[in-house]
Structures are given as C-alpha cells and as structure tokens.
C-alpha cells in the first residue's frame, strides 16, 4: 500500500526535476535522488504539492527500487555531464537559497564554512581546493626543519675547530699536511691558509659547514691509525720534506764563500760544476748563492753609509781644529794640558 501511495509522487517529482522515471538517471542509488526535492523547492510551482522527501523513508526492499536496480543493471550509464547540472543548480540558487540543504552530491567536497555562506555557492573544484588537508603544509614544514637539524650551529663549529686544532698539534701534523691529505684522500685540495682560517673561525658559515665533515673524517682516520705508517703519514712526510733545511759543513761553506767573492752571480754551468765538486745538489748551491746575495745587500748599505759619515766627520774635525786651534785647548779643566801632559810636553807647547 505504501508503494502505491508513493508512486504518483515519484512520477511527479521526476517530471518536475527534469528527468523521466524510466531514465537511467533515476536509476542511480539513493545518494543521487536527493537532488529532486532540491529542484522542486528551488523552482516552486503553483500546482505542485509540497511534500517531504519520500526516498528517505523508502525501505530497502521496495519494489520500485528493485525495479530501478534491475533496469540499471541492463542499461548503460548515460547520465549527463556535471557542468549543465551545476548550471541549473546555480540558476535555482539565484531564485532563492532558502535553507542550507546539504546534498550528498555536493556536500562531500564542500567545507562547512562554504555551506554557511549564502553569497558564494562554491563549485566542486573550489571547495575541493579549499577543503584540502593540511598534510602538504606539514610536509613542507618538516622538509624545512630537516636541513636545520643536520646543519651545525656556530657553537658546534667553534667547539670542533678548537678540538681539531688541539688534536692536529698533538698528532704532529701541520696545517699544510692536513690540506695535502684532504686533497689526496678526498679529492678536495685545500691550502694551508684555508685550514688556518678554519681553525681561527675566519671562514664564512657556509664554507665552515662544508669543510667540517671532511676534517672530521680526516681526524677520525688520523686517530685510528696513530702509530702505524699509513697514507696520511706518507703525505705528511712529503709535506715536511719540502720544509727541510739543508745544513752545510764548514769546509763546504768556506769554498762557497771563496767562490762568492770571485763571482757573486755564477752561471748555471758554474753552479753545476761547483755542486759536483762539493758533492751538493744543484738546487742547494743555487739557493745558497741567492741567500748570500740577499745577505750582502742587507749588510752593505749600512757599512757604506757609516764609512762616508765617518769620513765626513773626520774632515770636519780637522777643519775645526785648524780654525779654532787644537782640541786640547777646548778640553775640560780636568783634562787640561797642565794636568794631563808631562812637563816636557808643556814646555814644548809654551815655546
């Protein structure tokens, strides 16, 4: 009896909503049939009776619903595209938006604040963008926080630089040795100045952060291989070999001095023959002559200037004595000729 009562209402609602009862559109599940009362309420008709939503009280075993499901199983889904349907929905909203009726078709992607706003009925695209979860924002925040955890602070860099300098000195390596070892082991060649500026915290924060892991790896390897000949020790030995000072014997140095007085600037052939005769390396002899010439330049100008000044002072002294008499005449009373000279000398001076 309930089915015969609702059949005319269903037919009338289907005709008012713009869809025939036998169309595939009406054969959709119940969540799409809530749109028919909305259209009937949005476009009032004088002869249409005002009734509630009959589909909400329809039992699951209703013959009409079973008939629609059976028709839907045999007929393809040819429902119209959503764009004209949205257009009709906006036209009905222009006539009057009486109550914020929640439609399952639109309420799934529409946020609560959009349903309360009667001035801006949102579409599915805009609502889906505004109702997007905050997980992407949280994800970006985590990405920004991740590098900050790995980036050392200025206090960490200062503490590591101090520790690195102490360990380097204790292990007996110079700053040049560390730079050479980094270039050989890790492929990044650093000068002694760079290592010095790192220890003094004079590099930029970005360069300090880049250099810290390399120095930390080198320090760990140096600590673990202390006491055994490794590649680091060989590299350090090569670095110290360049700074080795050559000690020359006294007899060899005398021969070099004699040759220097004869020829301060020997030619390449003379340097080679002299090195062979003294059993020295050619580079050692060449460097010795360079250093000896620099030493001569440092010593010669003061001696020359001093000799000229002494000669000038001597001429002025004698001229002063010729004009004003002997210096003995202007001597203090304690050193007067009467007290400082013998009697014979005083007699000769009187005559």
UniProtKB/Swiss-Prot annotation:
Annotated tissue distribution: Restricted to the middle silk gland.
One cellular-component annotation, GO: nucleus
Record keywords, A-Z: Activator, Developmental protein, Differentiation, DNA-binding, Homeobox, Neurogenesis, Nucleus, Transcription, Transcription regulation
GO terms classed as biological process: cell development; generation of neurons; positive regulation of transcription by RNA polymerase II
Keyword Lipid metabolism set for record: no
Location of the region described as Disordered in the Swiss-Prot/TrEMBL record: 61-88, 131-154, 314-351
A GO MF label: DNA-binding transcription factor activity, RNA polymerase II-specific
UniProt cross-references to Gene3D superfamilies, sorted A to Z: Homeodomain-like, lambda repressor-like DNA-binding domains
InterPro entries: HD, Homeobox_CS, Homeodomain-like_sf, Lambda_DNA-bd_dom_sf, POU, POU_dom, POU_domain_TF
Cellular location(s): Nucleus
DNA-binding region, residue intervals: 241-300
Pfam families, per the entry: Homeodomain, Pou
Composition-biased stretches (Basic and acidic residues): 135-145
Domain POU-specific stretches: 149-223
Disulfide-bonded cysteines: none
Family of this protein: Belongs to the POU transcription factor family. Class-3 subfamily.
Chain's role: Involved in the transcriptional regulation of sericin-1 gene.
UniProt protein name: Silk gland factor 3
Species assigned in the record: Bombyx mori
Gene of this entry: SGF3
